């Protein structure tokens, strides 16, 4: 079975371009004829499938392999700007500097069409074709009432659209960051959002308008991108309008305020759509199209999570169910889960746009769900050690927000260093009572925090195979420690140490990673010998448990700093030996997963 990710869409904006993709499946439509008689013959060579594409576009009922639609990536010897046209959707969509698009936008538009129900996708054959609604849409006149009605039905069937509309319902504008933090599955890879106060802090340090716009457009989490993409659709439909919003925050006792242009407010037309979402009075509620794929994206156990959540939704559609009932319902299907995990999934269903009613501690999905099926090839998937340990930690977090479970995923994702630093800083300064921030720039530590007289210099390291603390990075920590001692702008003009208040006089350092390997303890001792400052290493799971001890009040903040005064790895007492063995197995498992995703053997 081909690996396709339907249900979440980025970087596909224009509804008019989506219509071109839909119309290519309608024989003898203007787009279909343009492709058959002009664009495909001119833009696609025989090597990349020209004749096969023309033949597929000439069938009475058009079914086209996904790969033929999407095309190939950039071949060896080419760049993205001059890569040859190799897919039908590539040819259907004009690019900015050439007559066709690359495979990435082509894939995004296909996923968009499938996600809103205008295209059907056959998993068995890996082919796309027009849905009944898509065929109706392909026949409509641009700007007609019929077109508007079909788009309403298509977009209101897409749960994330409904989620964003409901977030905007009270007419107060929200920024893409405020929407993004409330969109997606809780504490899971694939759903990150940049804390808005970090954006405000960053904007305060930039005066150049071009650089400010670059910060706002380039600094996004995945959920922020989903929010921005979906809001671009809603703007075209007239359901929301884009506005400037002035936002303020206090960080380390300093106030930051600025205007964020990527902010959105619901319109009167949008408020009428809310009535369809809720099924109020004569406004019929539109069934929700839920793709199996959208129930998890980047998580290592995504197929297992998708199956588990599919079973949940099946159980919740028929009647109100308690957590205990859902737990037993899963057990019958060979899945063992805690009530804590089930509760997080229920909250996440609300976050993706499904309507969950609660009555006397029982839950029910009030939407009619269509399109949700577990693929035949993926009926029985075992739970990995990675998910076992994550859910074990979930049960132990009674005070810390479960969204920080995302740190466990990020600690093993070498492509997510920035997010790992940001979420570590958020855990310490927003969830807990530390002051400080992520610095994470050239010649600065990743994170610095303090409490009372005690300060901690932190280096985050996300590595798929665990982190051994090479000597070069030990040297880097030594430089930070010595710069903090000297505090001279001639040594480092950025003066990062000003993050600490003058009253902070006791310092330690910490390395934070998913897992530590090799001779890292030797390097910890080396740093101490050279600087006379002690530190420690702490893996993500122990960091979360440390946070739980602090937030619950079972541990004092001075006691917390003592853990980083040993030149050793930090182990929190609640982290049992059997947890540790599973964690080591998890690290190996995550390394294999990362290798399979990135072509590493």
What are these regions (language model features)?
Residues 1-402:
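Donor-sugar nucleotide-binding helix/loop cap in glycosyltransferases
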Residues 385-585:
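Catalytic core segments in nucleotide and nucleic-acid processing enzymes
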């Amino acid at each position: 079975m081909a690996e396709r990710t339907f249900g979440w869409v980025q970087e596909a904006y224009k509804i008019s371009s989506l219509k071109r993709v839909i119309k290519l499946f309608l024989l003898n439509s203007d787009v279909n004829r343009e492709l058959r008689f002009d664009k495909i013959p001119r833009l696609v060579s025989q090597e990349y499938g020209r004749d096969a594409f023309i033949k597929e576009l000439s069938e009475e009922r058009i079914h086209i392999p996904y790969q033929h639609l999407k095309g190939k990536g950039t071949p060896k010897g080419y760049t993205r700007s001059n890569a040859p046209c190799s897919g039908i959707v590539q040819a259907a969509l004009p690019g900015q500097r050439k007559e066709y698009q690359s495979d990435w936008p082509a894939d995004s538009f296909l996923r968009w069409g499938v996600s809103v129900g205008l295209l059907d996708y056959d998993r068995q054959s890996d082919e796309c074709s027009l849905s009944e609604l898509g065929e109706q849409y392909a026949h409509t006149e641009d700007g007609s009432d019929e077109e508007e009605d079909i788009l309403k039905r298509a977009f209101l069937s897409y749960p994330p659209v409904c989620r964003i509309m409901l977030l905007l319902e009270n007419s107060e504008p929200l920024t893409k960051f405020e929407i993004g933090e409330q969109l997606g599955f809780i504490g899971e890879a694939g759903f990150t959002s940049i804390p808005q106060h970090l954006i405000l802090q960053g904007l305060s340090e930039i005066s150049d308008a071009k650089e400010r716009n670059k910060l706002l457009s380039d600094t996004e989490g995945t959920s922020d991108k989903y929010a921005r993409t979906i809001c671009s659709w809603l703007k075209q439909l007239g359901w929301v309008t884009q506005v400037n919003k002035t936002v303020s925050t206090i960080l380390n006792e300093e106030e930051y305020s600025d205007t964020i242009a990527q902010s959105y407010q619901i319109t009167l037309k949008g408020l009428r759509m809310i009535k369809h979402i809720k099924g109020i009075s004569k406004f019929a509620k539109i069934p929700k199209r839920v793709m199996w794929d959208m129930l998890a994206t980047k998580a290592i156990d995504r197929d297992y999570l998708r199956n588990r959540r599919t079973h949940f939704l099946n159980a919740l559609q028929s009647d109100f169910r308690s957590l205990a009932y859902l737990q037993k319902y899963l057990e019958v299907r060979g899945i063992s889960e805690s009530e804590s995990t089930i509760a997080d999934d229920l909250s996440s269903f609300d976050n993706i746009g499904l309507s969950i009613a609660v009555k006397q501690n029982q839950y029910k999905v009030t939407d009619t769900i269509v399109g949700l099926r577990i693929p035949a090839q993926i009926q029985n998937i075992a739970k990995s050690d990675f998910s076992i340990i994550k859910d074990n930690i979930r049960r132990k977090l009674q005070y810390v927000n479960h969204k920080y479970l995302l740190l466990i995923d990020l600690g093993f994702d070498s492509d997510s260093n920035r997010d790992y630093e940001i979420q570590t800083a958020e855990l310490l300064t927003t969830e807990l009572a530390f002051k400080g921030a992520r610095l994470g720039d050239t010649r600065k530590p990743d994170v610095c925090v303090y409490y009372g007289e005690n300060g901690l210099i932190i280096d985050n390291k996300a590595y798929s195979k665990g982190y051994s603390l090479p000597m070069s990075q030990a040297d880097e920590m030594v430089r930070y420690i010595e710069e903090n001692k000297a505090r001279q702008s001639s040594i480092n003009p950025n003066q990062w140490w000003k993050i600490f208040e003058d009253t902070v006089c006791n310092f330690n350092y910490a390395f934070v990673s998913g897992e530590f390997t090799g001779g890292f303890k030797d390097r910890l001792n080396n740093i101490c010998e050279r600087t006379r400052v002690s530190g420690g290493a702490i893996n993500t799971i122990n960091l979360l448990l440390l946070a739980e001890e602090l937030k619950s009040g079972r541990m004092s903040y001075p006691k917390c700093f003592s853990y980083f005064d040993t030149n050793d790895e930090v182990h929190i007492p609640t982290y049992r030996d059997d947890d540790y063995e599973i964690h080591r197995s998890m690290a190996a498992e995550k390394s294999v997963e990362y290798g399979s995703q990135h072509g590493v053997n």
